[in-house]
Amino acid sequence: MASLRKTHPLLKIVNDALVDLPTPINISTWWNFGSLLGLCLIAQILTGLFLAMHYTADIATAFSSVAHICRDVNYGWLIRNFHANGASFFFICLYLHVGRGLYYGSYLYKETWNIGVVLLLLVMMTAFVGYVLPWGQMSFWGATVITNLLSAVPYVGNTLVQWIWGGFSVDNATLTRFFAFHFLFPFIIAAMVILHLLFLHETGSSNPTGISSNADKIPFHPYFTYKDLFGFVILLLALSVLALFSPNLLGDPDNFIPANPLVTPPHIKPEWYFLFAYAILRSIPNKLGGVLALLASILILMVVPLLHTSKQRGLMFRPLTQILFWTLVADVAILTWIGGMPVEHPFITVGQVASVLYFALFLIFIPATGWAENKALKWN
């Protein structure tokens, strides 16, 4: 008689995704980040749920309700620190996951990749509206500056901004709706994750070599379940160290000051994980141009599959493109640094050069090098 996990309608789905899934034997630790992202999402939903039980989405009490959570609620400080720093770890895993996809050619699974890019956008939106909730100075001014960018949309811009604000400035209506969005989005993300996995399991995972692994697969359980559990332990340990020893390391000191519409902070900047996109936005002197560049910096990932010129899938055997990939990584690091710097010489010029290089690598250098490598190997 067949096992229940293979016959029961619900358990069969879980079994095919987590137990009997044929998995390439040679996938490295870079393939761990998908499951780590799942762990981050679950952790964020759970901690967020407990925070929402004590938080009040009202400008008069939002800031003090967060202080109340940290001071008076049992382990409230712990839940808050895990939630705030969990977001940072979420983005670390996200960027590493995307980087792995770019390096090993995972983007050639187009449906999986495009849903992944949509997921990235959704997580970024969720993090943005979540950052507004404590109603500190950086929360308020971050919300004001970023939502104001929509006024650059021709013809309907100003109406659009007022519609999002629910008034003529960032006020109580804005905070209330941002809380509603911040509560809703993670569940939409969870649904999209299921779609992401559905499309992934249509094709199976790629592997570091970029060639078919159909001849050499092993069951997901126990091999990769234990490998993933090891990753979970490392992630939770690192998150615990950050949340318990230096919970405010990645935050902004300005956010300990309650929001004040009459006082502008000297340097308005988002959380570290948005700084690269913020640097690209700031490097263009025109408002609409900056907004379009900001969008393009993420949406460019959607055109990566269309710009794949090489006859090889990944970069494992392509040293020239490897150099360009690591140049891209360094470029994003430079943009992240520039995004946190004041708008003055020489940071403006460095930001503009790094922004041009960012798009040039995706659109020109990497496709051209792929073509050149084909020529060198006489594979054209």
UniProtKB/Swiss-Prot annotation:
Annotated PROSITE patterns: CYTB_CTER, CYTB_NTER
Cofactor binding mode and count: Binds 2 heme b groups non-covalently.
GO molecular function, one term: ubiquinol-cytochrome-c reductase activity
UniProt keyword Membrane, yes or no: yes
SUPFAM superfamilies for the chain: a domain/subunit of cytochrome bc1 complex (Ubiquinol-cytochrome c reductase) (SSF81648), Transmembrane di-heme cytochromes (SSF81342)
InterPro entries tied to this protein: Cyt_b/b6_C, Cyt_b/b6_C_sf, Cyt_b/b6_N, Cytb/b6-like_sf, Cytochrome_b, Cytochrome_b_C_euk/bac, Cytochrome_b_N_euk/bac, Di-haem_cyt_TM
Membrane topology of the entry: Multi-pass membrane protein
Cellular compartments per GO CC: mitochondrial inner membrane; respiratory chain complex III
BP term (GO), one: mitochondrial electron transport, ubiquinol to cytochrome c
Quaternary structure and partners: The cytochrome bc1 complex contains 3 respiratory subunits (MT-CYB, CYC1 and UQCRFS1), 2 core proteins (UQCRC1 and UQCRC2) and probably 6 low-molecular weight proteins.
Family: Belongs to the cytochrome b family.
Note: Heme 1 (or BL or b562) is low-potential and absorbs at about 562 nm, and heme 2 (or BH or b566) is high-potential and absorbs at about 566 nm.
Function: Component of the ubiquinol-cytochrome c reductase complex (complex III or cytochrome b-c1 complex) that is part of the mitochondrial respiratory chain. The b-c1 complex mediates electron transfer from ubiquinol to cytochrome c. Contributes to the generation of a proton gradient across the mitochondrial membrane that is then used for ATP synthesis.
Name recorded for this polypeptide: Cytochrome b
Source organism of the structure: Neocyttus rhomboidalis (Spiky oreo dory)
Lineage: Eukaryota, Metazoa, Chordata, Craniata, Vertebrata
Originating gene: mt-cyb
